[in-house]
Amino acid sequence: AAISNATSTTSQQSTPMKDTEEANQGMAYLETVRSRTVTIYLPLLIFVFVLLFPFYWMVITSFKPNEELLSRDGNPFWIIQPTLSHFHKLIFETAYPEWLWNTVIVSTVATVVSLACSVLAAYAIERLRFKGSRQVGLGIFLAYLVPPSILFIPLAAIVFKLGLFDTRWALILTYPTFLIPFCTWLLMGYFRSIPYELEECALIDGATRFEILVKIILPLSVPGLISAGIFAFTLSWNEFIYALTFV
């Protein structure tokens, strides 16, 4: 009986302790949620709002009629009378489809040409180990830092002499002047991360340098090639000075 009474007393004492611990854990959880809300979620919400608001403004502006755009009385954050007249005018009353098609062709071809040249250049600099390869790599990086506006005048003279003004080839041939240095510099770092022992094993088995490049280096460099291709395509798409002058 004494043992049972002691057990019941101990259980009765442990029950309030458990309740207190659970209450403390609950309060700590609430404090954690509040701190996360203040320190993480609230700044993240503000960041997302600042990031997405320009796109929202762009979309609602494209659907507003001219009267609503110029009016000071309406709500600038909402559309009262949506319209598709702006899209109709852009597509059917301007040469926008042709401009878009030219941009796609020029950016795609320039990106492919630049990647092909950059792969060969980056592999030669990083793997062939000829005298002065590091200096060549540094020169390529410095060439990337040269602003396109400095190359504008000599490139314009070359394009004029070749008779390529107002053609797509004028941009396809000039865009690689700033795409190849960038892609080469980017791929040099990626090729450097690939173990050289893989190439040594392939050389022992009788593979040529071209076979090593195609069958070993390129498959392992797909993420780097994708990154370089995305950056090159973006730079080509956003370029304005050459496109405004040469075409």
What is the predicted role of each segment?
Residues A1-L45:
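Transmembrane alpha-helical segments of polytopic membrane transport and secretion proteins
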Residues L30-E31, R36-V247:
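A structural signal for multi-pass alpha-helical bundles of membrane permease subunits
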